[in-house]
Swiss-Prot record:
It comes from Pyrobaculum aerophilum (strain ATCC 51768 / DSM 7523 / JCM 9630 / CIP 104966 / NBRC 100827 / IM2). GO terms for cellular component: cytosolic large ribosomal subunit. GO terms for biological process: translation. InterPro entries: Ribosomal_uL14, Ribosomal_uL14_arc, Ribosomal_uL14_CS, Ribosomal_uL14_sf. This is Large ribosomal subunit protein uL14. The gene is rpl14. Keywords: Ribonucleoprotein, Ribosomal protein, RNA-binding, rRNA-binding. CDD domains: Ribosomal_uL14. HAMAP family: Ribosomal_uL14.
Length: 144
């Protein structure tokens, strides 16, 4: 019989299925005070695009992505960081049946371990991101 379970994620032991709304080469604004203003997504952590032919990696709320800073402080530009998706415009369905969509896409710059680089987060943060990343929940002023 096959083994059940698999890789564990940080935070909750399971991951909500969120419809991907941010894909490779997307330009996404940053929702914290780390100094970056606009980033480009260059990868999705945990997504293996080489195993499925021509599938473009996509990320939803709560996913960690690899980004490069396009606009912001000069010392941060052209640097590669990790980020967590905290808002997406594409609607996704929660387990209770409600549909959620935000006005914009947004990410928060984090360390590879998942600790935020900034000290505050601007705007609302999705509940799925706070459940998966508790350190982001501590900085969030509004959780939707």
């Amino acid at each position: 019989m096959a083994k059940r379970g698999g890789k564990r994620t940080v935070g909750v032991p399971y991951r909500f299925h969120v419809t991907p709304g941010i894909f490779m080469n997307s330009l996404v604004p940053v929702a914290d005070n780390s100094g970056a203003k606009l980033v480009r997504v260059i990868g999705v952590v945990g997504h293996y695009s080489k195993t499925v032919h021509r599938r473009i990696p996509g990320a939803g709320v709560g996913d960690m992505v690899v980004v490069v800073v396009r606009e912001g402080k000069p010392e941060l530009r052209k640097q590669i960081f990790r980020a967590i998706v905290v808002r997406q415009r594409r609607p996704y369905r929660r387990p209770d049946g409600t549909w959620v969509a935000f006005e914009d896409n947004a990410v928060v710059i984090v360390t590879p371990e998942g600790d935020p680089k900034g000290s505050e987060i601007h705007g609302p943060v999705a509940m799925e991101a706070t459940l998966r990343w508790p350190t982001i929940a501590n900085l969030a002023s509004i959780v939707v």
